[in-house]
Amino acid sequence: MSDSLSSLPVSDGGQFPSIGLGTWKIPDDVLPTLIPEAVSLGYRHFDCACDYGNEPAVGKGIANALEAGTVSREDLWITSKLWNTYHHPDHVRAACERSLQDLGLDELDLYLIHFPVTLAYVPFEERYPPGWFFDPEAENPSMKHVDVPYADTWGAMEELVDGGLVKRIGVCNLGTAMLRDLKSYARIQPSVLQVEMHPYLTQQNLLRFCQEQDIAVTAFSPFGASSYVPLSMADANESLFDDADIQSIAAKYGKTVGQIALRWAVQRGTVAIPKTQTVSHLQENIEIYDFGLSEEDMLTIDQMNRDRRFNDPAEFGEAAFNTFYPIFD
């Protein structure tokens, strides 16, 4: 990976690998071998979360990769996320320590607040990961909101940096208004914003704001609908892979649609975290550093924007968890 875009700088001077492996929905039995395969292909960035329920398996994969001697711990960038039920300052450190334990690590490269969603605390011994329902066995289970100021959660996140548990802290699923507010009181400024971002949801203003504020942006779901069709959160006809415009660009460069989407993401200055369970797709997804898109083709993809958000708690909260919980409105 000789391309200068193979990593992007973050505010503390670190280098953020621009293609990572997202681990959402990857089964436990796959990860212990998939992660070493990814490392052997050049991956150094792995995106995890408590809520994915597979951090112990990710940890086995990381341990296997380190044992193989291909990389050292210092070569890797491991991200995890604070879940919605742990926002109260009393629970933030314990949640981080649980992720560290599951991942077999002493320190995270990045710890993010997963959603601006504050749900009632569920003890580890009662259910872990706790998920979205407060009581899944209730007659009509739902999410249980509690009031926890985001500033209080952020203060506890800052203490994780002070304590050496994490190198950097950041946020997910925020817009410019909440970012401005956070920046006004943050002692340690957010290093990274992770949001849904793909050719059908380009979020140009949000990206520009973050770049001007020295906040790195991670694009999750860089292929758009593909992760959401099986969950009934997207229609099959919304697939980016069937889009004639991007297919035409892919043919022009002799690349796949997925490679074009990832190159666009990296070339516009974001980090992308595609998910896959196959070695062939792992290899395809990281082979994007041997070409560049023209300004015209970058603009064509920018103009594919439909403001189509697939991961929206206002929709899936009500459909799946019987709770209307808008955060983007």
Protein language model regions, located:
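N-terminal binding-site loop/beta-alpha segment at the start of enzyme catalytic domains
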Residues: 1-76, 89-94, 159, 222-226, ...
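Acidic (Asp/Glu)-rich catalytic clusters
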Residues: 10-11, 59-73, 100-104, 183-186, ...
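Hydrophobic faces of well-ordered beta-strands that scaffold small-molecule active sites
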Residues: 17-22, 46, 76-80, 108-113, ...
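Short histidine/acidic/glycine/proline-rich micro-motifs that form metal-
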Residues: 25, 52, 82-86, 196-199
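Aromatic/hydrophobic pocket-lining residues that form the small-molecule binding cavity
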Residues: 31, 92, 96, 150-153, ...
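Structural motif corresponding to the early beta-alpha repeats
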Residues: 77-90, 112-118
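Beta/alpha (TIM)-barrel catalytic core signal, keyed to glycine-rich beta->alpha loops juxtaposed to Asp/Glu
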Residues: 84, 118-329
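CE4/NodB-like, metal-dependent polysaccharide N-deacetylase domain
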Residues: 92-113, 160-163
